[in-house]
């Protein structure tokens, strides 16, 4: 069992969907690696109110093609239909997200969980020396987090800065392993 921790404050631009009356929003990230499971806790001011289990399913274990996340970004200069020649990988179909505790109707959280799982599969697990570094990278990820990170207030639209929040959380997870 190996454990990692990271603690930071949310920048003012990232916590606009949270209660504006409180200033310091503390984000605490902790990961505990077991033999075949990673327990990831993402706390906002010490609170966690939802738990999700992310496991590898779909075509990923069978067909592990190393395709960039954005597909083929280069222009080959040929006049042909890109849809016929290019294989686009849907990473959402590679994982199964099961809500253990929390709002199962929230459409944002499964996407967040899949992005965290992709970060682990592509970046973190290959870099962590000897820890679960297997050829097929089969692992289960148990994510407990505060859903308040993704909630919007009445004054703003539902998707206001969600991408920025996701990038910030992913960066915090990656920085946790850099220490």
Swiss-Prot record:
Belongs to the PSMG3 family. Involved in 20S proteasome assembly, facilitating the alpha-ring formation. Present with 1820 molecules/cell in log phase SD medium. Pfam families: POC3_POC4. Coiled coil: none annotated. The keyword Chaperone applies. The gene is IRC25. Keywords: Chaperone. InterPro entries: Psm_Assembly_Chaperone, Psome_chaperone_3/4. Disulfide bonds: none annotated. Component of the 20S proteasome chaperone. Forms a heterodimer with POC4 that binds to proteasome precursors. Interacts with POP2. One of its GO terms (biological process) is nuclear-transcribed mRNA catabolic process, non-stop decay. GO terms for cellular component: cytoplasm; nucleus; protein-containing complex. This is Proteasome chaperone 3.
